[in-house]
């Protein structure tokens, strides 16, 4: 039933009562998320299987996102190519570049798409509600009814194709003779192919890929989800279409709505325009493993158990100068669903490595193994990990880096990490949480955060939103 309240939280509370159904969506539960000054509603579309999370709050910068579980089976970059390709026209919007047209004509405050190691997300944000529906319409038609099935050139343009480079003399003649063609050089070209050539020319990206392959053998994380230029040309058009058909369907989707919006209208729009259409309900997957529902596709061992490391030391040669040499040390932190543990580990590593005076970083630099140490926590996967990188590394220091790191950690286990340092880091994180300065539209950042746990457990849609860094004071 329509609501008349101008308070989005009150309107949602009246409309979305757990145990009831609204526009084909079963309302499974309601939770308060005080960290975001919002109420969260978890719903499931009965006919299509689509999951939906609505965060009711008074933010006028409304957001919508649809994501899909997309664990790669190889490094052809098929999901990255799909991310580009579905935004090159659709059944309802048969224009060459609807994405570019939206940037020019919309009141959007965010408009993009992102490929992660195990998911692909299409988020938008705007302060105008009608504009939000326009954006939703374009994005939903793009992901469910893309033009890729009738226009193979989209795959060739965004993925890869052959291109013939002719000598300057032959180009000038332009006669297209067989002699001129024989003098040409055949090469690969394509938007994603070239993008990944650039990305993987960075030694840090190559090192990160190698560490992932070592930490997570026989899983989706062992592959480069963006695509390895050496593997991209192995992808066929037929495989590309089959991958879209198996993964880009409502039963494998995660939809987020956020902000001060008419949720009754939004749910009706989703149900009537897309999720209850025959094409949507008939595409419910029988083989759940195709969308990565089988945990073994993402993690080799039960959650909470570190993945076996089959590659302790690996050397990769690149055409780069010696001063760019890197050594990496990767540490699996557990499960993304153990949110407190992951955040506590992030805070701990900041205390150990976050500055030149941090004890572990100081010990590594004092050992003269390299010029600098950088580290980060990678939380966008089922088993988060910490990657410690030694820059300007001296030859043959991999084993020594591990020894120095372990010795420094043993010393800290015996004597402890200075409490005042941990307090300072937690206080800084608490301030950042209060400020909520994500650098992008809040609703978009929150949709991405939610998927960092929701993707792996339907009951964890709000876990990443409710357990913040501040809760680590309890530990």
Language model features with spans:
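N- or domain-start disorder-to-order transition segments that initiate the globular core
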Residues: 2-59
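Short pre-active-site segment immediately N-terminal to the catalytic Zn-binding motif
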Residues: 67-77
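Short acidic-hydrophobic surface loop/beta-edge motif
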Residues: 39-46, 307-320
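Short, conserved catalytic-motif segment at the N-terminal edge
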Residues: 60-64
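Short, conserved beta-strand segments within well-ordered enzyme catalytic domains
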Residues: 53-55, 65-67, 123
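Active-site recognition of the HExxH zinc-binding catalytic motif
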Residues: 76-88
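Charge-rich, well-structured scaffold segments of protease-associated domains
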Residues: 2-23, 71, 85-302, 317-338, ...
């Amino acid at each position: 039933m329509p609501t008349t309240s101008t308070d989005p939280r009150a309107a949602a509370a009246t409309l979305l009562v757990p145990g009831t159904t609204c526009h084909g969506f079963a309302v499974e539960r309601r939770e308060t998320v005080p960290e975001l000054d919002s109420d969260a509603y978890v719903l499931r579309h009965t006919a299509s299987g689509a999951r939906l999370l609505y965060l009711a709050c008074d933010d006028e910068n409304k957001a919508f996102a649809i994501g899909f579980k997309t664990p790669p089976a190889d490094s052809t970059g098929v999901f990255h190519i799909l991310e580009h390709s579905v935004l090159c026209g659709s059944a309802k919007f048969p224009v060459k570049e609807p994405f570019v047209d939206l940037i020019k004509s919309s009141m959007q405050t965010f408009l993009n798409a992102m490929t992660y190691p195990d998911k692909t997300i299409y988020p938008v944000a705007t302060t105008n509600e009608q504009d939000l529906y326009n954006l939703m319409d374009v994005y939903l038609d793009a992901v469910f009814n893309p033009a890729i099935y009738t226009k193979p050139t989209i795959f060739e343009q965004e993925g890869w194709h052959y291109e013939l480079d002719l000598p300057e003399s032959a180009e000038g003649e332009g006669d297209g003779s067989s002699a001129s063609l024989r003098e040409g050089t055949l090469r690969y070209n394509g938007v994603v192919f070239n993008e990944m050539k650039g990305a993987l020319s960075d030694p840090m990206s190559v090192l990160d890929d190698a560490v992932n392959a070592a930490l997570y053998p026989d899983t989706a994380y062992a592959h480069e989800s963006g695509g390895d230029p050496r593997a991209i040309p192995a992808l066929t058009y037929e495989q590309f279409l089959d991958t879209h058909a198996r993964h880009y369907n409502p039963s494998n989707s995660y939809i987020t709505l956020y902000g001060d919006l008419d949720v009754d209208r939004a749910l009706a729009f989703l149900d009537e325009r897309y999720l209850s259409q025959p094409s949507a309900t008939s595409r419910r997957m029988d083989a759940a493993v195709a969308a990565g529902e089988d945990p073994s596709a993402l993690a080799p061992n039960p959650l909470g158990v570190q993945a076996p490391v089959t590659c302790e030391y690996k050397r990769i040669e690149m055409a780069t100068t010696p001063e760019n040499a890197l050594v990496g040390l990767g540490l699996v932190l557990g499960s993304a669903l153990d949110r407190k543990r992951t955040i506590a580990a992030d805070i701990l590593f900041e205390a150990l490595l976050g500055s030149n005076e941090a004890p572990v970083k100081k010990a590594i630099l004092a050992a003269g193994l390299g010029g600098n140490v950088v580290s980060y926590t990678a939380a966008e996967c089922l088993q988060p990990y910490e990657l410690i990188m030694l820059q300007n590394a001296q030859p043959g220091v991999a084993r020594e880096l591990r020894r120095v790191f372990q010795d420094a950690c043993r010393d800290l286990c015996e004597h402890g990490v200075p409490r005042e340092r941990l307090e300072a880091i937690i206080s800084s994180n608490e301030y950042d949480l209060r400020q909520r300065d994500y650098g992008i539209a809040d609703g978009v950042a929150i949709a991405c955060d939610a998927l960092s746990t929701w993707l792996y457990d339907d009951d964890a849609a709000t876990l990443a939103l409710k357990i913040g860094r501040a809760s680590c004071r309890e530990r």
